Amino acid sequence: GVGANGGGGGGGGAGHANRGGDGGLGGAGGAAYGDAAAPLAPGSGGGTGYDPGGKGGGAIRIEADDRVEIHGTLSVNGSKGGANSRGGGGSGGSIYITCRRFAGSTNGLISAQGADGENNQFDYCGGGGSGGRIAVLYDSTAQAAEPRPAVRFRAYGGTSYNPLAGQSDDGTLYFPDPS
């Protein structure tokens, strides 16, 4: 998970759902970990470049006997390191929801994004943090009677200022059926 320190170059981005991006002329990205269908682990911190990398996102677990409605923001995004730090981006955390029925509006956002790597010089920038993991498990039969939820989901991986190195991959979204 944790990105490697840069040793003078950019710190590696933290891994979670996927491997973190490598730092420019520096640290390797962190390894992937966790379970897409039952995500409970928080995100990891990015590797140190000149200053420390960003922090990983936390973990949210919601368990309900019947209905969960999302009309606001649930966020476990990773964070960037300090400005001009060469630090790797922190990875997104985990959001795990189990319920009978799931609903929400267009104001609803569930987010586990990885943070961008920080910049100092083009070749020495930090790697991006991996996106996190989001799983919403519901009863498929009960859910079929509901309107399709308008909730938005984001689990993008962080980027790097150097497009030749440091990009991370997106996180995972898991639902019990593809509809």
What label would you give each PLM region?
Residues 1-135, 157-171:
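Glycine-centric low-complexity/flexibility signal
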Residues 136-179:
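Extracellular/surface-exposed low-complexity segments
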